[in-house]
Every structure is written in C-alpha cells, then in structure tokens.
Amino acid sequence: MRILAVEDEPEYLEMLQEVMNSLGHTIVIAPNGKEGLAVLESQTIDVVVSDVKMPEMSGVEFHRRVREHPEHRNTPFIFLTGVDDLTEVRAACKTDSDLLLQKPFPIDKLLKMFSGKMK
C-alpha cells in the first residue's frame, strides 16, 4: 500500500514512517497540503493521512481539494488532529472513507484503522 502522509510535525512523520514501513507499506511524505497535492498528481496513492493544522493550507482545505479529483473521491483519508474543536473536521468527514484520529493517539488505534478500513 502507498500512503501519503501530509504532516508538519517531525515526530508524527517519524512514527508514521516507522510503523507503516514495518508493515511493508510505502510512505510518501509531504510537509504541507500544497506539496501533498503535487504528490497526488504525480504518484499512485492508496491512502492519505493528513494533519489538520498546517502552514499554507489546512488539512480540511487539503481534503476538499483531494476530493475534487475524481480518482481520489473515495481514497481513504485519515485526519490527524490535536485541536479540541472538531466541528470543521467532522463536517468534512462525509463518507466512510474519511476517518478522524485525535492526537496523541495509541499506535494500535492507527493500526486498527488501517487494517479495518484500508483493505
């Protein structure tokens, strides 16, 4: 599985890389939504994991732009967030392909999301 991780916090990127690589997945990293969109246009991606609060473009805006592409309308998308007010993120989660994981999170919860929803 090819996973796009759009995250500006190095510790979460490192953790995602470690866990996904150990499971045999390939992880592609983008530090912001703008670069994430460029990756989606140039590579095949099976799952998107994105922070909500990022520079240049919020995760919610990034999600909206991803969903504008017909080939990514149903690509599994996991929001990672440390914000307390989840109203905007929950409003963006419109399909079964959209998931939310609040930081900090236990690794087993992330693994459960991947094993259950991402097959």
Regions found by a protein language model. Give the residues of each.
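Helix N-cap/capping motif at the beta->alpha junctions
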Residues: I29-A38, G59
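Active-site beta3 strand of CheY-like receiver
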Residues: T44-V49
